[in-house]
Design a protein with these regions (language model features):
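Histidine/acidic-residue-rich, glycine-tolerant segments that coordinate divalent metal ions
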Residues: 2-115, 122-125
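Metal-dependent amide/peptide-bond hydrolase catalytic core
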Residues: 88-264
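Structural signal for the C-terminal ends of transmembrane alpha-helices
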Residues: 1-2, 263
């Protein structure tokens, strides 16, 4: 790109801490986006999303959140459980209550318990404390807001019904993708021009991506995020994941073509 950028300023952002959801907010706080009009990102895709050698113009990431539920009951000897409030029993019903929440079935949403911990220190003791961790996802940001409200209500009301104290905390939220259609089409055209029409794949879904914090912090920012098929298998984040490095230049070519057209 040296010598090709003749209009404006090009920033190459190598953002840390994406997995902890702290990287993008740190970039925002540092003022990196203050003078930015367009933000374009990319990520390799697993074989299930995009075939090797193909590129999708938009990765439709969902909103994601981690919700921590703490249940406080009353300990008792297991021979006299009626004298206590068994927080494992409460946890089972809390998980069931969350699973019983129904949102629009035509949309994308899910909540699943990924951790549960309770240990009174003995096998014959009713535990007075239990914690649950939920992984929560939704296809749209307003849907996520409603989902979290319903989850909070389900947890708290279940606790009251069983005479336990339940607190719900969702400290971090990764927003869903909100793209600008005209910019996505420009990315699609760059894919056609560099990789060929036959290698433009349909949009794919995805996990969470804190790139979308940029748009949430600066709504006027035009954003797009494409996915490069590199044959990643068995999937992203798998400890035994492998992918074909020969396809990485496909993503580079899209970036270069887009920047040259936009700023050359």
């Amino acid at each position: 790109l040296v010598g090709r950028v003749r209009r404006g300023t090009l920033k190459l952002l190598f953002q840390p801490a994406e997995e902890t959801l702290k990287g993008a907010p740190a970039m925002i706080q540092a003022g990196v986006l203050d003078d930015v009009e367009y933000a374009v990102g990319a990520h390799i895709r697993p074989i299930q999303d995009v075939p090797a050698g193909k590129i999708c113009a938009a990765v439709r990431h969902t909103a994601s959140a981690t919700t921590f539920v703490t249940i406080k009951g009353r300990g008792a000897h297991a021979a006299r459980p009626h004298l206590g409030v068994n927080t494992i029993d409460v946890a089972c019903r809390v998980i069931g209550a969350v699973q019983d929440i129904w949102l629009n079935p035509t949309e994308v949403w899910s909540a699943k318990a990924t951790q549960i911990h309770a240990n009174a220190g003995a096998t014959n003791t009713v535990p007075d404390t239990c914690t649950i961790t939920f992984d929560v996802r939704a296809g749209r940001n307003p849907l996520m807001k409603e989902y979290l409200r319903r989850i909070n209500l389900a947890c708290e009301m279940t606790g009251k019904a069983m005479e336990a104290e339940v607190t719900v905390d969702t400290p971090e939220l990764c927003p869903a993708a909100e793209y600008d259609d005209d910019l996505v089409e420009e990315i699609a055209q760059s894919i056609r021009d560099t990789a060929g029409v036959e290698n433009l794949a349909k949009d794919c879904g995805g996990g969470g991506e804190d790139f979308h914090c940029f748009k949430m912090a600066k709504p006027e920012l035009k954003a797009a995020y494409f996915g490069v098929g590199v044959g990643a298998t068995p999937g992203l984040h798998a400890p035994n994941m492998t992918f074909d490095e020969q396809y990485l230049p496909l993503g580079v070519n899209v970036f270069v073509d887009f920047v040259t057209k936009k700023m050359g």
